[in-house]
């Protein structure tokens, strides 16, 4: 499965669609007949379904779709108020997790006067108490936070899991498919101490919130081992420097027995994945502008697997690419 992005000269924009092919490159075809923008395809654990995100008819949002491999039929399973991201199947295939921005009420100092009919007024003033309220490439940021949700893979009403007024990112389903492991910065001064995120676990009814890590520095990118006993994650001890190397760590599912996997690799790593037998971890790293794929044992024995990983777009002079 992969996403193909094309430029539409008639609409002066981009369009994206999901394509599928066999491992040997044969039987290459578009997955659906839809003309909407599609993204984020994910195989179900049993390989019988594919979840993906597709834009709505009016292009004002997105919905979660399911494609049934045997029948080649597909359908929306959600009716969301926003656009979902980072969809992930639970291990038992019953649910789909996702993150979504939830807007907050905009700060208003006084009640504005009533606008006369047919009046042409300037836009309302923007009032914010946020330290970070603008971003390069997107301009002013909306008031609100990213939260975690789940929905039945058969469709239905989504359930919001997190509610604290912080951003919740980089999540993973737990072994019993009844909750998430996620990264967030719950510090009171999180806007100023923005690097200091921790890992947490939470049940899918929003209760039983537990903090798993506690140090000065970011912890994120958690992936659960196949047997459900170990969590691998990324992070570093923040020494308040411009650049700091991201390292690989392990801990027990309850947050105990934390240790760094000493790889002797003086490079930041990303994109963790467990091997099926749980004995190795796959990851990516950049070496002198060359993106590589490697694996390591739980004791730090590294094997380089792929060199010269590249992407299909060039936006900035950096390395890149993706691996499945």
Task: Tell me what each language-model feature is.
Residues 245-254, 258, 292-295:
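Polyanionic (Asp/Glu-rich) segments that form extended negatively charged tracts
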Residues 22-26, 68-72, 152-156, 203-207, ...:
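Short loop/turn segments that connect beta-strands within beta-propeller blades
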Residues 1-55, 63, 67:
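N-terminal cofactor/phosphate-binding cores enriched in small/glycine residues
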Residues 10-16, 57-62, 139-145, 190-197, ...:
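Short, solvent-exposed loop/turn segments at conserved positions within beta-propeller repeat blades
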Residues 14-16, 101-149, 194-198:
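Predominantly five- to eight-bladed beta-propeller fold
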Residues 18-20, 64-66, 148-150, 197-201, ...:
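Hydrophobic beta-strand positions in blades of beta-propellers and related beta-sheet-rich domains
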Residues 1, 35-53, 74, 81-99, ...:
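Conserved beta-propeller blade repeats
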């Amino acid at each position: 499965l992969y996403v193909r992005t094309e430029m539409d000269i008639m609409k002066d924009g981009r369009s994206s669609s999901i394509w599928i092919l066999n491992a040997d490159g044969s039987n290459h075809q578009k997955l659906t007949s839809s003309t909407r923008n599609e993204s984020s395809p994910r195989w179900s654990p049993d390989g019988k379904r594919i979840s993906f995100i597709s834009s709505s008819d009016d292009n004002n949002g997105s919905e979660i779709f399911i494609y049934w491999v045997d029948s080649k039929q597909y359908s929306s399973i959600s009716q969301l108020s926003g656009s979902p991201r980072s969809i992930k199947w639970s291990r038992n295939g019953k649910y789909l997790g996702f993150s979504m921005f939830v807007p907050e009420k905009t700060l208003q100092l006084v009640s504005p006067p009533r606008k006369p009919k047919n009046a042409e007024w300037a836009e309302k003033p923007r009032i914010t108490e946020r330290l970070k309220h603008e971003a390069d490439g997107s301009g002013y940021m909306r008031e609100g936070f990213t939260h975690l949700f789940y929905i039945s893979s058969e469709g239905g009403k989504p359930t919001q899991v997190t509610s604290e007024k912080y951003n919740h990112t980089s999540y993973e389903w737990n072994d019993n498919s009844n909750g998430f492991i996620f990264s967030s910065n719950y510090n009171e001064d999180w806007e100023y101490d923005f690097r200091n995120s921790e890992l947490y676990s939470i049940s899918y009814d929003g209760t039983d919130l537990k903090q798993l890590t506690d140090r000065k520095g970011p912890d994120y990118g958690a992936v659960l081992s196949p047997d459900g006993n170990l969590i691998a994650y990324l992070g570093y001890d923040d020494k308040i420097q411009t650049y700091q190397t991201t390292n690989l760590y392990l801990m027990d599912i309850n947050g105990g027995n934390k240790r760094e996997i000493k790889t002797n690799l003086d490079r930041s790593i990303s994109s963790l994945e467990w091997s099926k037998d749980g004995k190795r971890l796959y990851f990516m790293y950049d070496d002198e502008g060359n993106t590589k794929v490697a694996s390591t044992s739980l004791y730090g024995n590294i094997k380089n697997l792929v060199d010269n990983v590249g992407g299909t777009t060039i936006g900035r002079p950096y390395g890149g690419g993706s691996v499945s």
